[in-house]
Amino acid sequence: MKIAMVGSGYVGLVSGACFADFGHDVVCIDKDEGKIESLRQGVMPIYEPGLAELVAANVKAGRLSFSTDLAASIEDAQAIFIAVGTPSRRGDGHADLSYVYAVAQELAENLKTPAVIVTKSTVPVGTGDEVERIIRESGTAVRFEVVSNPEFLREGAAIGDFKRPDRIVIGAEDEWAQGVMKEVYRPLFLNRAPILFTSRRSSELIKYAANAFLATKITFINEMADLCEKVGADVQDVSRGIGLDNRIGAKFLHAGPGYGGSCFPKDTLALLKTAEDYNSPVRLVEAVVKVNDSRKRAMGRKAIEALGGEARGKRVALLGLTFKPNTDDMRDAPSIAIVQTLLDAGAEVVAYDPEGMEAAAAIMPEVTMAPNAYAAIEGADAIVLVTEWDAFRALDFARIRRLANAPVMVDLRNVYDPAEVCAAGFEYTSVGRP
């Protein structure tokens, strides 16, 4: 089957490479000539474990190609995916759908053969209706159906998530469109991956509801962590104790500095805007957004408290900048607010991240980027572990004691055993643990 993937960013590139690996003939399309040329040369625009190798293998096999020419690329494609960005619109938090609608207009002008048009981008309820209207109003006589197929990929584990999904959600009620989508996902269908067919609007809402629920779990355990600190309980024990209940589950119950990234902040705001537009407020999600925003700054204040309440003139080493490990994504990363809180208090900040420093340097120019963790730690009055990269899970504390100006560690991801770190002679602060 020929598949056209419009948009070669994170979702489009991962999805396109995985579809090609399934045996489909895939062309990834993007207006950015520089990006397409780089992809042709094997240079990835993002860091995702295994992606460069997957792309190279499928390009070599002749199943994956890249183009800036949408009209030529969609010719004879049976499925055309829209995988362009939907960033938060400035001012109101609604998803900016201008890129999606621009693609719909271009498809309307160039569609020559029957195709199922699939919105892979995360879009608010009713977007598929508008995409369909744009194309139908062009007067095209070519058969097409608009389908919703949201992605549920985790950055850092996207390839595994795509190939071994918990479920595949497809918003399509037309029998022909359902048949095309079954063929698209045939390898997973044969492996008995759950495929849920719903209405298009239900599919669009499922994506937002899922992300809002996960954001709620994260925020809940973070608030429990704060309570644990007050009452002398251990949030990790609390998390295990409730997570063993099958009705709750253990995932997303790890206390930390709050959620960030390209999905949860954007999607919770978009859901709130949709709820407002339909006069059906979701107060729980409103509270989640508010609590999470305040938490990031609170983690900066926690670091200042570990410094004795005074950060002016102090040197703070940050380990990890990206919103999670195994990605270079700095979007809405907790480190941004933590750094700003420290800088506002007069601290000097030195940081190291295995993959995120290039992106971080552009948004936090006042921060000194170190070549490795130990270089960041040298002369530091406090060490703040922000992102739980594997590279930070086995630090040499004897070496750190020699390098650091003061043995103070703030572990915002609860990576270490408090007794172990204290035994090494450190003043140790973690999240939600006595």
Question: Which residues make up each language-model segment?
Answer:
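Structural/interface elements that position substrates and couple domains in central-metabolism enzymes
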Residues: 1-434
